[in-house]
Regions:
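Sequence signature of WD/YWTD-type beta-propeller architectures
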Residues: 1-278
């Protein structure tokens, strides 16, 4: 049994990383356990996305059609739970032309939540209601019940911990976007807004869930991605490539005192770690 990084596309491998042509066309992809998810824009007048749930051989098991533009995708460590985030338009409360919709699918039972905004949200300990609540960037714990995500309201972002069984979520910390839970379940990698405006607004950080201490990683470029853990000490993420409209996958140790960023794969996106030959 061996593990290898996987991406939704790739033309140039660096330092031994490999890619293969699967025949899939995905705007976002993620694989874990015995499942993968491929979310792709669906041609048509209205904004639609196909969420294709795949088995380990990347055969389609189930397809869900939802409204919006692909943004994020995640699968729980076991492969049972699948989540996605889409950009949507038309919300009257939105300060810009877009807001988000996040959904969760239980592949074992078929239970589908197309919009997690029905969660009972507790903001800083108090039950919270507001029409502008948006969730994105879901990441699952290994019990297929607990999850983390970003929630935004009144111009602020928060890390939330959610419970699927009770359908409740509570905020843990401000200024956390696109969380990614470490394989050992003790840390969250996330992008933190470090400056206002559209130019280089984010920097990757790692949050210790036990101490709530956050540490920036050695990557100083602005990363607009939901980083993936390749192991307990390495993150992978996409950055814009040299050609317009392309991206490359980079890695960085979570220990800021270790080596700096390294190019893993050119012309690729949506990194994830899969186990081959198991």
């Amino acid at each position: 049994m061996r593990s290898a990084p996987y991406s939704s596309s790739g033309a140039g491998a660096a330092d031994g990383a490999r890619s293969r042509n699967t025949g899939l066309s995905c705007d976002r992809f993620y694989a874990s356990g015995r499942s993968a998810v491929c979310i792709a824009s669906h041609p048509g007048i209205s904004q639609k996305t196909k969420v294709n749930v795949l088995d380990r051989e990347l055969n389609t098991r189930k397809t869900v059609v939802v409204g919006g533009i692909p943004n994020r995708a995640r699968v729980s460590p076991s492969g049972r739970m699948v989540a996605w985030t889409l950009f949507v338009s038309g919300d009257s409360y939105a300060s810009s032309s877009f807001s988000t919709r996040s959904g969760i699918l239980d592949t074992r039972t078929g239970y589908l939540v197309k919009n997690v905004e029905t969660l009972q949200l507790y903001l800083e300990g108090r039950r919270y209601h507001a029409p502008d609540v948006n969730y994105w960037g879901i990441t699952f714990a290994d019990d297929d019940n607990r999850f983390y995500a970003t929630v935004a309201t009144k111009g602020k972002t928060y890390l939330v911990e959610g419970d699927i069984t009770t359908w409740k979520a509570r905020t843990l910390r401000r200024n956390v976007e696109c969380p990614s839970l470490s394989p050992d379940g003790t840390r969250i990698a996330f992008k933190k807004r470090v400056r206002e405006g559209a130019k280089n607004p984010w920097r990757l950080h790692v949050l210790d869930l036990g101490t709530m201490r956050e540490t920036p990683v050695a990557e100083t470029r602005s990363v607009d991605d939901q980083a993936a853990w390749l192991d307990d000490s390495t993150l992978a993420y996409a950055l814009p490539g040299r050609a317009k409209g392309t991206s490359d996958i980079w890695t960085v140790p979570v220990d800021a005192s270790a080596a700096g960023p390294r190019l893993l794969l050119s012309d690729a996106s949506s990194p994830s770690m899969v186990v081959a030959g198991g």
